Amino acid sequence: MPAADIVRTVTLAASPAVVFDAVTTGTGGWLWPGEVEPRVGGAAGPGGVVTAWRPGRHYANRMEGEGGWFNELDFALEAGDDTEEATRLTYRHSSVFDEGQVPGVEEHTDFYLHTLAEYVAWFRGREATFTSVDAPESSRAAGSAARVLQALDLADDVEVGDAVVVDLPGVGPVAAGLSYRTASFVGLRTASALVRVFGREAWGAGVSVSVHDFADGADAAATGSAWQRWLDDLFS
């Protein structure tokens, strides 16, 4: 299997210092929680090693495995041209991917970077309570992502940027903005949370939901239980 690079350049509405903190210590706010030892050679999550550490400018980590396998994530930061509150991020994901895996990784990359942009724009520096739940195996079937959107009352004509009221499990009806929508993924932003729906049936996997909750007193166990019941009922 050949190695490949997935590269994206995005502009984020935050300073390089804020973005650097987000990709090193604030990953629970947009990806999932992880711990990084702040030095080259330090630990970066399970099995990873920090390979670049220049606060406000450059962070990278690498993991290696058997048979020459590796996985490397690289975040290069530059200040925006017109304002200190803008950062040009060049993100590179280098790895040995399975055949046919790259398109799915590219779509996930775009969604995660969008969530990073939402985090630094709306919730920067705030601690997130992270929850992730998986739907039953039956959600591997074609059309499962659309089924979730229908259950959330997000009709086909609801577009990115639209304001909606969504009945979220464990929360009830809440005002939200639809910030991301593709055939597979949906992003919602409320006043206190980022809700992410992953429909992975196109790649042989099921639906999952991640919630980054920035409210005081947020309860990951309660949020997870509410979403799990909702998904189990939907795909029973």
Language model segments and positions:
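Short, glycine/acidic-rich beta->alpha junctions
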Residues: 4, 42, 69
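Hydrophobic ligand-binding cavity/cleft-lining segments
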Residues: 1-37, 103-160
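Well-ordered beta-strand positions in beta-sheet-rich domains
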Residues: 7-9, 47, 72-74, 173-175
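Beta-strand/loop substructures that line and gate deep hydrophobic ligand-binding cavities in soluble
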Residues: 58-108, 179-236
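Non-catalytic interaction/regulatory modules that flank or connect domains
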Residues: 142-193
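Short loop segments at secondary-structure junctions
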Residues: 16, 53, 80-81
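Short, hydrophobic/aromatic-rich segments at coil-to-beta transitions
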Residues: 37-43, 52-62, 161-163, 181-187
